[in-house]
Amino acid sequence: MKFGKRLKHQIQQTLPEWRNKFLCYKDLKKLVRLISLAPMSLGVSVGKAEAEFVYLLNVEIEKFNSFFMEQEEDFIIRHSELQQRIQRVCSTLGPEGSQPSETDYKDEMERIRKDIINFHGEMVLLVNYSNINYTGLAKILKKYDKRTGGLLRLPFIQKVLQQPFFTTDLVSKLIKECESTIDRLFPTVKQKNKRADMVERSNTTTDGLNIFRNTVAALETMQEMRSGSSTYSHFSLPPLNIPEPDLIRSVQLNSPIPIP
């Protein structure tokens, strides 16, 4: 699948409020074509055209950084609140709590489980947001250099690698901690009970279902973009260092619908 179609599909699959935060790849692609076809006799110098192109790329990067940092800050707060909530429920309603109640404890932990799954999914979506926008920038810069004879790609990508939106270490750490919490509090259901458990969880919210489906789509996109190919270069994203089964399991665990 060509990148433009993949990006369009990913935007359609993501959360509605995120859709205008992605790279304007189609517009930039049109601009590259216009620059490459414009006769220099019209008075448009190569330097001026390149400056305009770089300006638009910088506007896109500012958009990515602003959105990414806003989401990252929100995730830090939500992660802390979830941990405090878990501790509070366990210390109050748990078997060794100050006011133990099996029914209330079970109900609260079920709500926490759904919130953790949704939270995990949103964080995976943000990592995918970083990946797909970086890939888009690398591809549009490659097109620019190829069609204009410019040498913009290497220095610009070196700049991109230092941008906040590309630095996903903190979010990846939160994802790992979230997965550890899931494994600790909600062990994987045995196979013979899995179907009944899926039916029981089918009452989850529409938002939860949407986040789950979008997360699966994001994981598939990340695997595709990071897999080795004949066009792999030092501009490409490295392969995922987490095996796909673990990624899928971490999302499927206690999810409302099974992944084929």
Question: What do these predicted ranges mean?
Answer:
Residues 1-135, 141, 161, 190-194, ...:
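Phospho-regulated, Ser/Thr/Pro-rich intrinsically disordered or coiled-coil terminal scaffolds
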Residues 145, 151-182, 186-190:
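Mixed-charge, low-complexity intrinsically disordered segments
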